[in-house]
Amino acid sequence: MKNCGWVFALMLLLTICSTTPSVAQKEKTVAEHAAGAFEVKVEAQGEADKAEGSTLGRYSLDKQYHGDLEGTAKGTMLTAGTEVKGSAGYVAMERVAGTLKGRSGSFVLQHTATMTQGEPHLSITVVPDSGSGQLVGLTGKMNIIITAGKHSYEFDYTLPTAQ
């Protein structure tokens, strides 16, 4: 039991953090929806790491957003492909800079995706407290739609009301 002190400290920290409202939580927020198109350039960063059963890759992302979100994004994506057709995964971080429905600043999106034998699962969320400028306090989730090779986004988000 003498090594349980760190467990208690961690539980105490989690309890304090979960009950202490952040600055963004104290302010009134408004739910919004944004949509538009984007172009993306994906470029391999080095050679793929191939081994029995899987291939790992690293890529740079360069995006141009249009519509309710006008701006650019740069990021890094890590991928894993398998020998099973339609099964793979990726994680990515991208820093978006631009104007979201008239409010300028930047924020970071975190992507987590898997595909199991052709069945995709994708989660794209705003990294907490990553907003800057007029986008401080931004939270939200983005969805990507690909139709006939064209990319578009749907972005449900909240922001503190403008002062």
Where are the model-predicted features located?
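Bacterial N-terminal signal peptides that target proteins for export
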Residues: 1-8
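Bacterial N-terminal signal peptides
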Residues: 8-18
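Beta-strand-enriched cores of mature, soluble protein domains
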Residues: 22-163
